[in-house]
Amino acid sequence: MLKNKILATTLSVSLLAPLANPLLENAKAANDTEDIGKGSDIEIIKRTEDKTSNKWGVTQNIQFDFVKDTKYNKDALILKMQGFISSRTTYYNYKKTNHVKAMRWPFQYNIGLKTNDKYVSLINYLPKNKIESTNVSQTLGYNIGGNFQSAPSLGGNGSFNYSKSISYTQQNYVSEVEQQNSKSVLWGVKANSFATESGQKSAFDSDLFVGYKPHSKDPRDYFVPDSELPPLVQSGFNPSFIATVSHEKGSSDTSEFEITYGRNMDVTHAIKRSTHYGNSYLDGHRVHNAFVNRNYTVKYEVNWKTHEIKVKGQN
């Protein structure tokens, strides 16, 4: 049921002249070897690993790009974290009541990378700052000698010998780094604000997503239709994040990395109430972070010599 894909590509980059057209990640996968320029000062060796959990509603697609640079005194690895995190939005009767319906939905998506290897250090990552735009596009570039730099957009990579880009959509959500140190980085993609028929609403509004049909028996009808829900609530999130790590040459042959995808869930209650005149309406009540860290974590073993990737465990 689970498929592992391995893509090996060796790329050569000349030290003598920078690339006029830098190598991008979408080089044809059919080519096992691609030579860029003259000489072989840099080799980029690529691996890809896919893991899916039906239990958690998550697919991890991880690209491992080994950077072998004769002008850099360390090993380097670029990890691009892609895949899909299902929203797991659910509608149900609250504690078998007839007048209270519940909507469980993702207030936050979690993406994280961690290692405990003393010879490994996190040296760069994307995105870095809080990003509120709907469409996120950034590039991480590498120049010979261990120089990693980031560019703000997909078009800002002209001076790099090698580059890796991220691009994702986060309508009504914002991205920010929640934790970061030399061994780990954790991002949160959090609900922000929503345009509704009654105006702009904060992600913390108690009436957010509460609908207009208090006489229905179907819990789904107590909340707004799918056409009024953003994709990250209705369907899910396609992450695209990058982390770059260095490894001390001549130390350990292997290192382990834990990569986590998941979500924190809020619950909105739609409560049927009546006015003094007997008219029914729906009143919202909110439970923030009702279910947190509903995460799928996979432990990957990286071999710095053979460039093999092994899955060592998952929850």
Swiss-Prot record:
GO terms for molecular function: toxin activity. The keyword Chaperone does not apply. Pfam families: Leukocidin. Residues 1-29 form the signal peptide. Keywords: Cytolysis, Hemolysis, Signal, Toxin, Virulence. One of its GO terms (cellular component) is extracellular region. The keyword Repressor does not apply. GO terms for biological process: cytolysis in another organism. Leukocidin consists of two protein components: F and S. Leukocidin causes cytotoxic changes in polymorphonuclear leukocytes. Belongs to the aerolysin family. This is Leukocidin-S subunit.
